[in-house]
């Protein structure tokens, strides 16, 4: 996933930096909240149930902060395949969520922060290289 941002107009919400659409932002926030409410770790079955509830439009939440929905119970619908392709897989590849192959669990991770530091260090090295000509 490619993240393009304007450092002068950086949103306060990390999800707005990472995800392209409001719907993706909402679903990603709901996923993180669900994992946090389960002690920071969920199993494959719980993830599948979350994706299925979203797919069927049966996921009810009050966590949306947008103007017309704030504080109200809202049913959320999101395609299951797109959830895995556009939300979960990018979150895993960027290091926001880790999957433990042995325990078969998903957990919130700080690897994203570590990778951002590494990217910053790569830029410093590139900046300090002498010109090739």
What are these regions (language model features)?
Residues 1-40:
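Long, low-complexity, charged/polar intrinsically disordered regions in eukaryotic proteins
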Residues 103-109:
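Minor-groove-contacting beta-hairpin "wing" of winged helix-turn-helix DNA-binding domains
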Residues 111-133:
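Short, amphipathic alpha-helical interaction segments positioned at domain boundaries
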């Amino acid at each position: 996933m490619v993240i393009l941002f304007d450092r002068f107009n950086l949103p306060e919400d990390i999800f707005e930096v990472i995800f392209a659409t409001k719907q993706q932002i909402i679903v990603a926030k709901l996923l993180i909240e669900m994992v946090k409410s389960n002690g920071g770790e969920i199993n494959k079955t719980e993830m599948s149930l979350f994706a299925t509830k979203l797919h069927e439009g049966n996921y009810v939440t009050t966590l949306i902060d947008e103007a017309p929905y704030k504080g109200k119970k809202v049913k959320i619908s999101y395609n299951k395949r797109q959830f895995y392709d556009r939300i979960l897989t990018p979150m895993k590849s960027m290091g926001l969520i880790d999957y433990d192959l042995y325990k078969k669990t998903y957990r919130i991770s700080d690897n994203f922060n570590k990778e951002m530091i590494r990217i910053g260090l790569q830029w410093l090295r590139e900046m300090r290289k002498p010109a090739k000509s």
